[in-house]
Amino acid sequence: MIKKILKYTKNLILLALSLAGIYLFNLFFMKPFSIDHFLGKELVLGLVDSPEAMTYIGIFDRFNWLTRHNSKLSIPEKDDQENSIKQYEQVIKTLYKYEDSSLSEVQKNTKKIAIFDAENNLKQVKEFPHHDYPLNQIGGIHLNTIEFLSDMHPIRNESEAKDFIKRVNLIKKLYTGVLADLEEQADAGIFPPEFVYDHVINQLSDFINYNYDEHPLYTQFLRKVKELNLSIEKEKLYEEQIKIAID
């Protein structure tokens, strides 16, 4: 009797795994059965592609041992434009495969909105790849990165403190990627309004000519580390590490 129960249990588990495998294969490598599932998948992939977004949401932090998102930043890469074009083209192609006759009224409207959004994004990436200003007087990457780390990155334990330092160490690589984008923008003859330069130069000067006691990455990091109630030796160690990362 026990053997039969174990056999049936084993078969049910294998069946469940097989069905799950078929569903996931269909979801990621074919046109999913449901347009809702397809759009949900795209939303999740968009979030997973941005370590900052995963930190903002917070629910992924418990899986950081797997995702490692809390120690990463979105670094501009040379092939970002090409990858975005391919992604949007694939999304549009898949959306058009869903026949309106098989969709509810809500799904039809969702399909129209999704296609409109994807086609607009594709047009922007193809025709206007350099028409945004990554450095500006309001919320450029130089300000947003500092604000994100000081305000949004959680430090609830030593692991997250170490991740903070890893992210600060990545800022130089991030700025190098942004600089490459700015050079391409300049080669295309696209420049922000002149008044932006003075604001950005002043903002960058504040980060370059700093005292540690005034730098938000230093002050916020130490404040959060002190709340962990670590030993004085560990606090001193982390203080030295964040100084090195900022330099």
Positions of predicted regions on the chain:
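N-terminal maturation segment of proteins
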Residues: 2, 6-247
